[in-house]
Amino acid sequence: MNEAEKITAEMFLPEMVQRYPATRAVLDLYGLHGCGGPQGPREQLGWFARLHDVPIEKLLRELNESASQAPSDVPEFAPSIGDTIYRPFFLAGIATVLTLGCMWGAINLLTIGLKQSFTAVNYSWVLAHAHAMVFGFVGFFIMGFAYQAFPRFKHTSLWRPKLAFTALPLMIAGILLQTVAHLLSPSSLQLEIAAATIQTISVIIFASTIVMTARQAKKPEVYDRFVYAALGWFLLAAVGNPVVFKLFELAGSREQLLFNLATFNIPYRDVQLLGIAVVMILGVSLRLLPHAYGLREPSRAWQGFLFWGVNGSILAGVVLFIAGMSSGNHWLLIVQWLTTFVLLAVAIGTPRQYRLFGPVPENERDRGLKFIRAAYVWFIIATAMLVFTPIYNFAIYMPITGSHVPFSHAFFGAYRHALTVGFIMMMIVGVSSKVVPTLSGVDVRRANSLWPTFLLLNLGNLTRVSSQIATDFFPSAYSVMGFSGFIEVVGLTLWGYELFANMRAGKKLERETSVHEQNGNGRFRITPQTKVADVLTHYPQLLQVFLRHGFGPVANPVLRKTMARVVTIEQACRREGVDLTELLAELQNVEISDQPANSEPVVPITRIATIQ
Ligand code: HEM
């Protein structure tokens, strides 16, 4: 047995890659591809095997074989656009939360609270907030996560990463334009159509990238159909978006607006929240929870019920509700109500299937788990509220308040935020808090625990849901509700900052590696993006080459320590009008002696004098 065969399931990825650089190629084959930086995330091999669905014995055998490879055979670490594609999407999601999304929602809520009326806030503002949350916050996180994780889970690479990326600027532009269209309504239909078209193109790009990635992978898995269904709901929501804008923003009269809202608001939001977000979350849970936390895999029968039950109830619910409301046939609405029981059954049964609240081994636990557990508790609360809605309306709301309309806006809004903030947002916060440090090469178990975010988000949402229902009976509850949004925003700001810091750490790691790009011999590689100072630190003798090409400032030790640290070879060439290819060739071809890395380059005194 040689030394290489000491690679075991307990070994941490970075330690292994550091000792046996050739093993990274094997991890790449199973979907590592730049995740966690050049040496992979700080996780054990057993965890990697489970997450990437590779039999551990096979993985260990291949790793041990590759470990004995000659250092010169080791491929260079060259991260590509697809390797960190989640980053700009997640950043856009965080930015949305802190501006048009939750921040705007909190301002709306404060206005409602202070004026003690749900109609006190401009409805266009509510619509703009809701749209930014669904297409922006939920959309960006779903896109970023899917682009990053889907190809890796399937041991392939992302189909056309540059095209995939364009979904981001398109979606940002579409959402911003749509926000303006809401603010300018009713004179903004054309702007809305333009905004909706751009967003639809973005969704089509996203959906086709995922479908084509799956096709090239040829590795069908149980959760795939959830992803496809969520993509289908996303497309439907994108196509329906301008229609809904017209119905809600451009209704001819108040009666028409009330009819449109009563008939189409619930179905449209169901397509968005249940169709896009909940279906995708259920699919991601299926892939992530058993593989990342070692939880039990739901039975085949439950997986089937989960898929057909949820998608069936959304579809039937949407059709029956629209038909019932527009025809006045109450039987259709009763059947629609029955579909909500399926959602409640899913919410109760799914965490049981995973044994989500059972013991999880110490080494599998991390900061994301508490959010994921809380999310499933909120899912049960939200679906129980949904089932209870007609009972509340007829048996509690109407008799106590004397209302003639069997619909409490307060109760339904409370249900909606139990689902959106409690389940959808909590889940996104939990999963992102787990994957971002992992992908950035930060040890998730040593990272910030995010307890303040967890407590504030739950406290804020609990206050919001309970006080919003209480506004039906006690006007004083409005003021409590009014401030609850800011509790959530503070929690989310802490979370956003933490993720941002994790991503920055990952970026730094990559920069360092791209600067210290090494091949199997541990040798430094010079590329157009390499900083001038790094070249000189590694190969002080190359100073002469720079000077020959007219880079005067590098002769000055102070400028070498300052300016040269931030200027890349490419930038320096542009600045000095030097041919990049020629310089690179010369730098790379110079016979490099093994000079100590830290030695100061020696500049002839006369040369310094002439340059300065
Ligand atoms: C800090 C978090 C949030 C705050 C303070 C907030 C605030 C509000 C307010 C004040 C309303 C209007 C009142 C009402 O109808 O009940 C509203 C509506 C809405 N919000 Fe939020 N929200 C938050 C998070 C979210 C999230 C995470 C989502 C989606 C994932 C979301 C989606 C919606 C939707 C769909 C509506 C209904 C719009 C309609 O009437 O059609 N919100 N939100």
Where would I find each of the regions flagged by the language model?
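A helix-coil-helix interface module used to build multimeric assemblies
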Residues: 47, 162-169, 603-609
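Hydrophobic alpha-helical transmembrane segments of multi-pass integral membrane proteins
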Residues: 70-519
